[in-house]
Amino acid sequence: MSVVFKDPNAYKGRVYCFHNEPVQRDVMGYKVAGVSKGDVIPQGTPLVANDNDTNGQKTAKIAKYAKVKAKTSTTVFELENIGFLAVGDKIFKSGATDPTLSTISKIEGNVITLSEANSQLAAGDIVVEGKTVETAGGEGAPSGDTPVTVVVPKDIPNRIVARTETMTTLNQTISATHQAIAIKNVLDYPEEWLNAETFPGSVLLKGCPLILFINQ
């Protein structure tokens, strides 16, 4: 089934996600995996891009996240927009100290049901697709080399979709940017994707430091 966004060019019904329009676009576009004919990919969608894959092509996939609109129970949540999240995806609360990774077992419209309870999530929170990794003696690990399992984002985006695109063919390419000024409080990206230490009051995209986020 195609993914259709209402008012795809604007976020929150009134604001564009870039400080200057039109935003600078990369030369040529990216073939995006995991999308279908008829899907609408909004401006501001985060991408994990590869400028030269094993076939010598420019390819990308969508980094998944969403904002919680309402909480029905510890397993049922309404999102502001389901975006490209799918059944089977694992998500966690952005910014949580010890995040719980939960699997999406059901989707109805913008309402998701989790296969296990997640008491950390509430209205206004950002959820991001995640995975577990083992660390030893590094960040998140106790002293010594005892392995610990931590939850981290599945993807760190390095491009942002430059303009809204509707997929008319499966081989269609998507315009993206690696150099832009984006509006942080419009896109609501997870903090795990951002570097907040470079400029006071603004941040950079971890995967691409030429994309600057400002509050407006």
Question: What spans do the regions from the language model cover?
Answer:
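Surface-exposed, low-hydrophobicity beta-strand/loop segments enriched in small/polar/acidic residues
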Residues: 1-216
